[in-house]
Regions:
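ASCE P-loop NTPase motor core, strongest for the SF2 helicase catalytic module
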Residues: 30-258, 265-430
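Charged, low-complexity intrinsically disordered regions
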Residues: 1-42, 112-113, 228
């Protein structure tokens, strides 16, 4: 206010929308806005009307809200801002970004740098490659993988019209190799990986030279304000001030003292640069998710084993003093885990068990009914040994399946997920 009263003031472009909203709310100061200021506000407020061309291949498959996401990303880049695409999980953030990358490549002039870098958790690296091959097969893309020598060669030979895909961990290791490259676009997936701004991963991501930066996350960005600051420090350094100033003026008042003014100020500042849509708001044509609890009472030998193990645990606890109880918590948790395993299938605890399991039988019945109805199924278990039992039963029932465990390599996992999505079938799990 002091600067405005003196006559003129200049603000960074990323402050324009916030300043405009504040000026509309008060009449104490009469302000004249120059043409550049007005044009910027108009561009950002009418971004859905910009006539950015959606590539023909994606035009046919994008939903309405995904097209809006594409226009939003293009508008941010056009105005030299960064942003957070925070759509709910399952709304196709990857597809929106791939459409944006493909449009950038198609619009580029000969010799113009359109090199892009996608940084993602290791488990999603090959998924990004598969999605590019599926939705934009003409988009040149390379997964930076292999040993140190191979990765350095891939980075060194990256063309100006190429998308490089790497993991957060490998970026940290290969940072020196990237220092000679300039990127037109830098994208971080699962942006919460840089939530702690002092970590080596966060510092590495921010050292890459890039013209336009975009962060993807499926969680509400206001959940943790220090995380939000770190992400914006990557996108537009200085936008949320230094962390010390941000913490003093916004984070502490909002979090510790529930200061609504501080939170409102933050929301007004970030609103133009965050796009979040929820499934319930944009997928109105889809039915609500139905949840149903099904109970399978224990029977015969399985019930006897469960009751015997329960009695054993009860006797063990009854004989312990308070001091012994406090020191045997891990043992007690192990016994409770065994009870859960007996509920799944007693053979997980008792070697050589040949009896039935009511829970296993119900599971197989549900699977068979779903398969007969032409449905796909995702089946989870906390016990890999239970997955082994299910694999035997599925083979016997001639039900095709894939089995993913912690020992499945990233490459194999990506192949399986792709095959499952494409309805390619195999009889044997790896």
């Amino acid at each position: 206010d002091r600067e405005l009263k003196k006559g003129k003031t200049q603000v960074p472009a990323y402050r324009a929308m916030y300043l405009d909203s504040q000026l509309k709310g008060g009449d104490l100061i009469k302000v004249e806005k120059d043409n550049a200021f007005r044009a910027l506000i108009r561009n950002m407020q009418t971004m859905e009307e910009h006539k950015f061309q959606i590539p023909r291949e994606q035009e046919k498959i994008l939903r309405g809200y995904q097209k809006e996401g594409f226009y939003w990303i293009k508008t941010l880049k056009h105005n030299q801002f960064g942003g957070i695409l925070a759509d709910d999980m399952g709304l196709g953030k990857t597809l929106q970004v791939i459409t944006f990358l493909w449009s950038e490549f198609q619009e580029s002039a000969p010799g113009e740098n359109r090199r892009a870098l996608v940084i993602t958790p290791a488990s999603l690296v090959f998924n990004w490659m598969n999605e590019i091959e599926r939705f934009a097969p003409g988009l040149p893309a390379t997964v930076v993988t292999g040993d140190v020598k191979e990765r350095k060669a891939l980075i060194k030979n990256a063309g100006e019209r190429e998308v490089l895909i790497t993991s957060y961990d490998l970026l940290k290791r290969d940072l020196k190799a990237y220092q000679n490259l300039d990127f037109a676009v830098q994208i971080i997936d699962e942006a919460q990986y840089i939530k702690n701004h002092g970590t080596q991963v966060a510092k590495a991501v921010k050292e890459i030279r890039s013209e336009f930066r975009l962060a993807l996350t499926g969680t509400p960005v206001e959940n943790r304000l220090s995380e939000l600051w770190s992400i914006f420090d990557f996108l537009m350094p200085g936008f949320l001030y230094s962390y010390e100033k941000f913490r003093k003026e916004i984070e502490l008042p909002a979090v510790q003292y529930s200061n609504s003014d501080a939170m409102e100020r933050l929301q007004k500042m970030i609103r133009p640069f965050v796009l979040r849509r929820l499934k319930r708001d944009v997928l109105k044509d889809l039915p609500d998710k139905l949840e149903k609890d099904m109970f399978s009472p224990l029977e015969s030998e399985q019930k006897e084993l469960y009751e015997a193990h329960t009695e054993r645990l009860r006797l063990m606890l009854g004989m312990q003093s308070d001091a012994e109880f406090r020191t045997s918590k891990l043992q007690i948790l192990a016994e409770i885990t065994r009870l859960r395993q007996i509920c799944c299938y007693p053979g997980l605890v008792y070697e050589g068990y040949k009896g039935n399991s009511s829970k296993l039988e119900m599971c197989m019945e549900l699977v068979q009914n779903a398969v007969n109805g032409g449905h796909k199924i995702l089946l989870f278990s906390q016990f890999t040994t239970m997955l082994d039992v299910l694999a035997v039963r599925l083979k016997k029932a001639k039900v095709s399946f894939y089995m993913l465990t912690g020992s499945t390599s990233k490459e194999k996992r990506a192949q399986m997920v792709h095959a499952f999505n494409e309805d390619e079938r195999q009889e044997e799990p790896d």
